[in-house]
């Protein structure tokens, strides 16, 4: 799903138990004897069970060599330069950066000189974790926190480095600390799920290993290289997280 230069705003809903009850009763009365009403109600709650990420992209490339050459130019300016086989008729796409906030993504899109740039929405469905219970379910929830920790640190560090708010060495230290955090999460999850023969547990372990590998791949030869590399890893992190939650 791609969004082109159109500003949207998210909804921020605070629900109290009594309000929920009134809301359900009102909807129930309004949609009485209407099958569509209950379907729409289900869709309202379904929307709260997903997260959206926004990839700043340009598309329309048919030739992979040309796309990769353009991606290198993007990297040389601090962008992710991630080449993605496009969907929605966009051909091969080049990703500049990833965002978890639509307003932030829209602001950046508005400043891009290339008028063909757009926002590609990545929808991540929250897992119900029906396969897990008790201590295992708690361990899984704790392990899945790796993504938010990694995304936040990489995103903030790349932006701070780009704005000269931190030095290259400070950025390296932040990523080193992050790697230790993810490593600890991995170790704890492994110990709590040892002996459990489960495809889902294996998938989560692989996701944690992949996250550590992404952090190891961050380059520090220059500020521009570091910014680009971190943004590249963020894109991969989002896509891997999307795949993970679709499997667990």
What role is predicted for each listed range?
Residues 1-248:
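Acidic/polar low-complexity segments and flexible, solvent-exposed patches
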